[in-house]
Amino acid sequence: MAGVDSGKLIGSEIHGFHTLQDLDIQTMLDEAYSRWLRPNEIHALLCNHKFFTINVKPVNLPKSGTIVLFDRKMLRNFRKDGHNWKKKKDGKTIKEAHEHLKVGNEERIHVYYAHGEDTPTFVRRCYWLLDKSQEHIVLVHYRETHEVHAAPATPGNSYSSSITDHLSPKIVAEDTSSGVHNTCNTGFEVRSNSLGSRNHEIRLHEINTLDWDELLVPADISNQSHPTEEDMLYFTEQLQTAPRGSVKQGNHLAGYNGSVDIPSFPGLEDPVYQNNNSCGAGEFSSQHSHCGVDPNLQRRDFSATVTDQPGDALLNNGYGSQDSFGRWVNNFISDSPGSVDDPSLEAVYTPGQDSSTPPTVFHSHSDIPEQVFNITDVSPAWAYSTEKTKILVTGFFHDSFQHLGRSNLICICGELRVPAEFLQMGVYRCFLPPQSPGVVNLYLSVDGNKPISQLFSFEHRSVQFIEKAIPQDDQLYKWEEFEFQVRLAHLLFTSSNKISVLTSKISPENLLEAKKLASRTSHLLNSWAYLMKSIQANEVPFDQARDHLFELTLKNRLKEWLLEKVIENRNTKEYDSKGLGVIHLCAVLGYTWSILLFSWANISLDFRDKQGWTALHWAAYYGREKMVAALLSAGARPNLVTDPTKEFLGGCTAADLAQQKGYDGLAAFLAEKCLVAQFKDMQTAGNISGNLETIKAEKSSNPGNANEEEQSLKDTLAAYRTAAEAAARIQGAFREHELKVRSSAVRFASKEEEAKNIIAAMKIQHAFRNFEVRRKIAAAARIQYRFQTWKMRREFLNMRKKAIRIQAAFRGFQVRRQYQKITWSVGVLEKAILRWRLKRKGFRGLQVSQPDEKEGSEAVEDFYKTSQKQAEERLERSVVKVQAMFRSKKAQQDYRRMKLAHEEAQLEYDGMQELDQMATEES
């Protein structure tokens, strides 16, 4: 299953998930081995199948925990998975049970489940919606269970708050000690029926595999059943005797040697479960001072906050599930360095946190003498392992350390040490580079070793849904990028002409330009100093420092190379083994910093390689949006065309190359810029007068309070108007120029020669018209002849069929006449024996039935309709190409992102030019 990382989900008013982040696909896939999907999760997946991959072939021998999507209309045999399933009595049909699942208060999902023939505990479930418009999408879940021939454990109503019938008789009141209001009721029902200890493990497994909202009871305080001391004592003894590993999700809590604070409910007086040697096993106390628990241990009481919220809001909360609670408890126990009853231990959870966000645990270590900074929030609480992520750490300094409030700190995330930049009082920002997936500890430090804050569990997640336009996988893409880097470095270091530069005579103008370029690029020395300082302070990771070193080396070498070219009167005709120059390789790699260096050196950005491609062509071909923005802001021409090839005889623009690679938004942006640039060139040449009205209207328009989607559509409409107006003005200029050329030719031509030319033209036109008429007549005659020939042949074939049938009937008649003697000789026997014994008519000859003559169907091909259909398809394709950006929201978003990047690059380039001009005036 793959899809996009974020997006609004369809049917959120039914299943309760608004985005993919709320749905938490990764956690769902991880838990697919140990539990069935809930009805609201299934409904969300089936309604939003466009975000995931639809399998086109059946899976072969899927393992436990496998979840796949199929299209029943496209793949009828999706159940042929290679497993041997239980059959019906006929031994052929798979024995599948059928039920309807409820989402909310209505039945919305079909479920068909089958058991394995060889392994009865291996179960397959097939889900699809009752909605006729979406019933073709099927979700299939395979799982190894602990029950045989059991009904689906998925509750019929995912929002139900009643305890189901298969709940164990002994249940202890439990709740998370976080600030999440996920308990919309006041307690749990405790039943007094006693069962044998031999079934305890099965019951405990059933309890821990229930959904969290199945354990909730109606919020009727008067009718609640309160747990007795005998019930609690029984459950405590069972928890002590339960072996480790026998319970999933919540098993760490049963095997943990410590105390767990259970929040209070109406009717229960602060029950605390103790499992240590200082107190009897299974004892419950209503006072925190009993059994060695510190009465100052911080806890949270939810009885006041629960009653203030409606039940639906609490059930829709991200942590309203038992699995999330189990993960929180597991992290709490695994990260805790000591006993739970340690007063220094404090479990903090952010209220209202999404279910896709990992549980955050703060705890202090005994080796920390004092906490200087108290972290209250870290945003975001997780990051993708393949991306560089910006982290905001919020908190406050203790009163005795307020003088450190404006100092920069160091953020320690696992083995990484990155600088934490001060933004405002109590807020720090740091950038985490890509790391391997996993959960690490995050804290702040002054010297990079000793923590000054509590620890924060930070998770690096693996990317499951990638939405990039790069067709190669990540490894091949990295190798390709590395190859371009090697080619650039080789070209820069092998094309040096220092000896010829030093021995040749340098003109004063070139020497002055070289000095200006050297003064403008003097800031590169500061970059070396900053890199050395960062490495010595151990503020950057090794991979990031290595990349900075390589990039800084290329910058300095490019600076020296440009100085040589300026002295050599800007002779830059050096290519690598594949015909690319330095600026083209920089464009492919997306090195936007090189554009400013080329601009300062006054070297053309439209320098072509051996194929006639410019840097803008290469940047558009590889989808380098920032590089395209930097080139356009520096003055690169978007209307240049590559050299003609066999596939494209007229050459390609940068927009054509971007469209070939699937970058529709970038192609639309470059196409608009190409038309505007062509218009400005013709305006400069004097072929067009006036300006584009759409550009004026766009500059004067106010975006207002439009959202992102409306703004993207507005930009798309503005781009279409600009392109249409520019194209119309250019075509009008072409027609006007052609009319002027014809008028001038008529004006300066002599009358005799003009008359001769007119007569010759009339003769040619007359001859051409006669030729066209004769050709059409000949073509019509050939068509008519072929049609008549075909018609005559068809009639001949029909007549031959009839003649063959007549001949066959006649031959049969002759054969029957030859056998009349035999028929007469057996007549007596027929009458005497057959009539007497069989009591029926005798043999009277062969009755030949005349076959029905079927005329062949007349299939006359209509050439005019075929040609008309082809013409309509051509017109439709043309319209699709023009309106491509209107049909794709992704293209509109790409266009807007490209537009904003260009505006930002233009402002940055203008600012650098102003600073350079001010520095020149001062000097």
Swiss-Prot record:
Q: Does the keyword Disulfide bond apply?
A: no
Which PROSITE patterns does the UniProt entry name for this protein? ANK_REP_REGION, ANK_REPEAT, CG_1, IQ
Q: Name one GO molecular function term.
A: transcription coregulator activity
**Pfam families cross-referenced by the UniProt entry:** Ank_2 (PF12796), CG-1 (PF03859), IQ (PF00612)
GO biological process terms, alphabetically, are:
cellular response to cold; regulation of DNA-templated transcription; regulation of transcription by RNA polymerase II; response to cold
Coiled-coil intervals: 887-914
Give the InterPro entries listed for this entry.
Answer: Ankyrin_rpt, Ankyrin_rpt-contain_sf, CG-1_dom, Ig-like_fold, Ig_E-set, IQ_motif_EF-hand-BS
Biological role stated in the UniProt entry: Transcription activator. Binds to the DNA consensus sequence 5'-[ACG]CGCG[GTC]-3'. Regulates transcriptional activity in response to calcium signals. Binds calmodulin in a calcium-dependent manner. Involved in response to cold. Contributes together with CAMTA3 to the positive regulation of the cold-induced expression of DREB1A/CBF3, DREB1B/CBF1 and DREB1C/CBF2.
Annotated region Calmodulin-binding: the residues are 824-846
Any one annotated GO CC term = nucleus
Q: What family classification does the UniProt entry report for this protein?
A: Belongs to the CAMTA family.
Induction data: By heat shock, UVB, wounding, abscisic acid, H(2)O(2) and salicylic acid.
Task: Write the record's keywords in alphabetical order, separated by commas.
Answer: Activator, ANK repeat, Calcium, Calmodulin-binding, Coiled coil, DNA-binding, Nucleus, Repeat, Stress response, Transcription, Transcription regulation
Does the UniProt entry include the keyword Chloroplast?
no
Instruction: Provide the protein's localization.
Output: Nucleus
Q: Tell me the ranges covered by the IQ domain, including all copies.
A: 757-786, 799-828, 875-904
Q: Found in which tissues?
A: Expressed in roots, stems, leaves, pollen, top of sepals and siliques.
First and last residues of every ANK repeat: 611-640
Q: Spell out the residue ranges making up region: Transcription activation.
A: 272-372
Residues in the DNA-binding region annotation:
25-151
What name has this protein been given in UniProt? Calmodulin-binding transcription activator 5
